[in-house]
């Protein structure tokens, strides 16, 4: 079983860069606030397409696709809480629990990310088989 994670690696790297920029320049959040709905829509489309591109470039079984969607979502959504932990450690020399930063909103974002990624994988898989 060979899984090609090149599309996801590019997406994860860009997401990491965006989070680093956010930590360096937090005021940019307020400048982008009016476009939040458009950015959420674009983010959802990107996650769907990354999932589709990942499965098209590698043939995997159904359980592997679900596990891949879970791990990819967990890795992506964990970037911001880990950054918050590092920022607190740098500023205050104090480390809080990971669960302290992983609020209910992160669980909802995680669920949406996983479902979109998995949906992209499934549609990509079935379109290769000629079922879509």
Identify the meaning behind each predicted range:
Residues 2, 53-64:
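Membrane-interface helix-boundary motifs at transmembrane edges
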Residues 26-34, 80-108:
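Interfacial non-cytosolic loop connecting adjacent transmembrane helices
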Residues 4, 11-15, 19-22, 93-132:
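Alpha-helical membrane-associated segments of multi-pass integral membrane proteins
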Residues 5, 11, 40, 47, ...:
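Small-residue packing motifs within transmembrane alpha-helices
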Residues 17, 21, 25, 50, ...:
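Alpha-helical membrane-inserting segments
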Residues 38-58:
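Canonical alpha-helical transmembrane segments
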Residues 43, 65-91, 109-113:
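Hydrophobic alpha-helical membrane segments
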Residues 1-44:
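N-terminal signal-anchor transmembrane alpha-helix
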């Amino acid at each position: 079983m060979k899984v090609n994670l090149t599309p996801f690696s590019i997406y994860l790297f860009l997401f990491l860069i965006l989070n680093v920029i956010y930590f360096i320049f937090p005021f940019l959040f307020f400048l982008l606030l009016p476009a939040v709905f458009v950015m959420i829509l674009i983010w959802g489309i990107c996650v769907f397409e990354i999932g589709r591109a990942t499965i098209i470039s590698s043939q995997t079984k159904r359980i592997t696709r679900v596990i891949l969607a879970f791990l990819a979502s967990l890795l992506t959504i964990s970037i911001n809480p880990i950054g918050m932990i590092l920022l607190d450690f740098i500023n205050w020399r104090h480390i809080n629990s990971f669960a302290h930063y992983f609020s209910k909103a992160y669980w909802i974002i995680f669920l949406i990310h996983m479902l979109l990624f998995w949906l992209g994988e499934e549609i990509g898989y079935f379109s290769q088989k000629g079922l879509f």
